[in-house]
Amino acid sequence: MEKPSAPHLPEDNRLPLKVNESEHIAESGESTVWKMGIQDSLGNEQHIALKQNRREAFASDEEMQKSKEFYEFLKSFPGFGKFVPETLYFKARVAEGDTPQAFAIQSLLEGRTLDEIPDEELYRDPEVVKQLIEFAHAAIDILQQTRRAGTLKPDFGVAGTASEEAQRQGNTFGNSRFTTNVLVSDAPDEHGQRVFFIDTGVNADERVNKTRQVVERQVMGRLREFNFNRWIKKLEARLK
């Protein structure tokens, strides 16, 4: 059977970007992630990650504001914000006549997500291990805070494009060691950061389903917290 072709952006797209090249790199639910080379206002090429949310309801002014507010919550949360890359939100039509959709832009980070990195490679660099410990502590704090407040939490799950084992570990057993939403960059940024939480949006199903929100906070959130604590002990043992 012939493998279906990957999605592609039309050359005459209506995005407010001067796109030199684009490559489809991930798919999860109603979201698509593109790797792009774009030309800025000075004529310089920049490489970005563009996340497209195809659910029309999320492109309303109200929902766009909620997306920005959730990003600002993550960015300003003590201990967690340092892991969140700068993100720009906007809405646009992909092609003439299309319904507007919601988009988010981040500078492209070269690296791999946790589900793609085996233990021995992930734990090889002590600085990465230290940052993972910091991240896990911050993730526990934000899970506890959102549970107390009854508000939306970050998505520490695994996308459907990951391996079956990563999905089983991350989505069934709540083990965020395998999340597709944390990336370890190949090289540190100007602040020495290598660990990044790259999905600054709310899980789409949680966003529209109040019952799912409660279950995720009270059940899966607690399970993720338990697994984060176990992971911290494992990471700390690597530094001894």
Report each predicted region and the residues it spans:
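Conserved kinase catalytic-core helix
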Residues: R112-V195
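Catalytic-core segments of enzymes that bind and process phosphorylated/nucleotide-bearing substrates
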Residues: E206-R238
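Juxta-kinase regulatory segment immediately upstream of eukaryotic protein kinase catalytic domains
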Residues: M1-E23
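Short, solvent-exposed loop/turn segments that connect beta-strands within catalytic domains
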Residues: Q39-Q46, F80, V94-P100, D186-R194
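Activation of the activation-loop gatekeeper triad in protein kinase-fold domains
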Residues: I198-A204
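A conserved alpha-helical element in kinase catalytic cores
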Residues: N53-A92, E127, T211, R217, ...
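Conserved structural core of kinase catalytic domains
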Residues: K82-A136
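ATP-binding glycine-rich loop module of kinase domains
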Residues: E21-E23, E27-L74
